[in-house]
């Protein structure tokens, strides 16, 4: 750490968590001239306890490994991640054995690698690397913070704080709030906003590796030779972010070196937080709801536990032409399902880095306006997934349809631009936002349709009595989106063509999803091939009403022309079960099932 502080810095970063440390490293890699002061009120970086955000997906995996140049370190000190896997209990079984659970997954590894991160270790490494440069100054124990933001373009911001009784006062061209849920600038600028996501989380570290494949009374040989592997393959399931699902909730298992991260995320309308708000209660709840964990979890030593009563929040603004910005949990934050936190850090830090490196004020003004629109759009697209159709977690079919739709959009509209450095090209961003807005309207409609189907199915369809194994790539639209991983170094015109292809692919997938639900409700797979009917679907105004759906299809039932699908339209048909008898429906409604 430099022995002497400067009076002025190009950038002052408030907070030294994953977002702030990542931004500092990205800036230091981008310029050998920028001076950076980073301060944190805590006395130790990283802290001792657990932090959520341990799993990465493709955007964040690429960002940390390639953009921040940590690839060799990640492979050496952390685990390579084996995708996301999802599990559901099987009706009529006690579900005390892992092999009793249905599974949806991607069998192969991602060509854009992802990682399971020990947050404390990676933050320690980022800080170590930042401190190797003489452009970087770092202060712990920074309290009595005061920020006076500049009111004119040619004025600097003023930041003061004290460390162990010594006051420091500096000026800065840029001030970045990365102080997490302290929301320093959100509160100061009156930017705090709520959103429609009301989910809590209770999570912990336990000692050692909790290997879910051995939550069984089968022998090692029986586990190795289980015929289910003809579907699932041989890669170690424990390397995945594993999700054990029920309506409106999921329980994760994430491997870290020497320990396992476990956590429950839940809709607060369905689970009172008081029932899971300490480690003993959490273990008890999990062993009751997912009985296979009773074989192992009560024997584990809890290393750390924490909780959030309200995980997600919005923010009115996250970047300003007068050279301040909010990143990470200091700004907009979503639900942890799909591990989007690292992605938001990756995208926001990239936009903020580009803004900081922009010297011309007129150019900065244009970029800031566009980047704020982009950040709102990227964040806003997540909200229906969490606020509208979270209940679909309770059914393998409904959730598989939901996840394939969301992952297809993610691959084509999040991963593709990020790995091509396109989010900082204004020509591309304008084109992106135009196309993304069309997807947004369909997304809201489809998420509502999926949720209604889930609730209808609970009442009207028999549950599965044997496990089902489903690879998400069996629905062909996802594979089309994954091919964008290999479209690298494209021009803006070429990128627009890719977006158009991906928009068409997503619309085709939305059409398939709606048609599948119609066919399942009507109990007739012929619905999936009726071109006249399928082309009549209004994807932006899908309405779930069984009688109206029957009448809608009847208008087209006589048509014999098949729809020209590019993949198997019956890919998800094995999820469809017989209808319940009228007495079973009445009993289910009485029981609230």
Predicted regions and their residues:
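Beta1/beta-strand and adjacent pyrophosphate-binding region of the FAD-binding site
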Residues: 3-19, 37
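Conserved Rossmann-like nucleotide-cofactor binding loop
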Residues: 19, 44, 182
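Glycine-rich FAD pyrophosphate-binding loop
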Residues: 28-52
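N-terminal FAD cofactor-binding segment of flavoenzymes
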Residues: 46-95
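Short beta-strand to alpha-helix junction loop
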Residues: 106-128, 271-277
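Predominantly flavin-linked oxidoreductase catalytic cores and closely associated redox partners
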Residues: 129-291, 349
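FAD/FMN-dependent oxidoreductases across multiple families
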Residues: 241, 247-249, 257, 267-390
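C-terminal helical "tail/cap" subdomain of flavin- and related membrane-associated enzymes
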Residues: 356-593
């Amino acid at each position: 750490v430099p022995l002497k502080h400067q009076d002025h810095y190009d950038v002052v970063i408030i907070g030294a968590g994953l977002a702030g440390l990542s931004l500092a490293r990205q800036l230091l890699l981008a310029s050998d001239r920028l001076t950076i002061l980073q301060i944190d009120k805590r006395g130790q970086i990283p802290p001792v306890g657990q932090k959520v955000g341990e799993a990465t997906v493709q955007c964040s995996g690429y960002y940390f490994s390639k953009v921040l140049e940590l690839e060799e370190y990640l492979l050496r000190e952390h685990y390579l991640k084996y995708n996301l896997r999802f599990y559901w209990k099987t009706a009529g079984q006690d579900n005390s054995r892992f092999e009793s659970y249905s599974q949806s997954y991607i069998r192969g590894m991602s060509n854009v690698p992802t990682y399971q991160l020990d947050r404390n270790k990676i933050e320690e490494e980022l800080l170590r690397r930042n401190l190797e440069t003489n452009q970087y100054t770092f202060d712990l124990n920074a309290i009595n913070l005061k920020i006076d933001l500049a009111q004119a373009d040619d004025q600097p911001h003023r930041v003061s704080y004290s460390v162990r009784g010594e006051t420091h006062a500096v000026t800065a061209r840029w001030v970045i709030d990365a102080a997490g849920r302290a929301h320093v600038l959100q509160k100061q600028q009156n930017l705090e906003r709520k959103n429609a996501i009301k989910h809590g989380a209770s999570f912990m570290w336990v000692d050692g590796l909790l290997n879910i494949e051995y939550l069984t009374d089968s022998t090692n040989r029986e586990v190795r030779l289980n015929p289910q592997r003809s579907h699932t393959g041989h890669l170690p399931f424990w390397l995945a972010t594993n999700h054990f699902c029920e309506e409106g909730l999921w329980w994760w298992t994430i491997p870290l070196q020497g320990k396992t991260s476990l956590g429950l995320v839940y809709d607060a309308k369905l689970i009172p937080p008081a029932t899971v708000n300490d480690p003993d209660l959490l273990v008890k709840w999990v062993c009751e709801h997912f009985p296979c964990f009773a074989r192992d979890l009560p024997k584990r030593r809890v290393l750390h536990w924490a909780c959030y009563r309200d995980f997600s929040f919005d923010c009115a603004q996250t970047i300003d032409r007068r050279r301040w910005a909010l990143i990470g949990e200091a700004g907009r934050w979503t639900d942890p399902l799909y591990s989007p936190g690292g992605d938001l850090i990756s995208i926001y830090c990239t936009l903020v880095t580009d803004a900081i490196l922009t010297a011309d004020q007129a150019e900065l003004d244009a970029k800031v306006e566009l980047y704020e629109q982009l950040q709102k759009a990227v964040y806003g697209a997540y909200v229906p997934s969490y606020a509208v159709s979270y209940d679909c977690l309770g059914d393998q079919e409904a959730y598989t349809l939901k996840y394939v739709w969301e992952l297809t959009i993610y691959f084509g509209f999040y991963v593709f631009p990020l790995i091509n450095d396109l989010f900082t090209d204004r020509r591309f961003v304008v084109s992106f936002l135009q196309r993304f807005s069309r997807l947004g309207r369909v997304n809201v409609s489809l998420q509502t349709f999926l949720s209604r189907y889930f609730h209808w199915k609970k009442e009207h369809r028999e549950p599965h009595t044997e496990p089902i194994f489903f690879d998400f790539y069996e629905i062909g639209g996802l594979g089309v989106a994954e091919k964008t991983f290999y479209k690298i170094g494209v021009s803006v015109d070429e990128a627009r063509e890719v977006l158009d292809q991906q928009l068409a692919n997503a619309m085709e997938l939305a059409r398939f999803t709606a048609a599948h639900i119609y066919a399942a409700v009507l109990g007739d797979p012929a619905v999936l091939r009726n071109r006249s009917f399928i082309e009549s679907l209004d994807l932006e105004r899908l309405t779930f009403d069984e009688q109206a759906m029957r009448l809608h299809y009847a208008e087209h039932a006589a048509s014999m022309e098949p729809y020209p699908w590019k993949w198997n339209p019956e890919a998800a048909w094995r999820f469809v079960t017989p209808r319940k008898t009228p007495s079973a429906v009445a009993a289910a409604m009485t029981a609230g099932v």
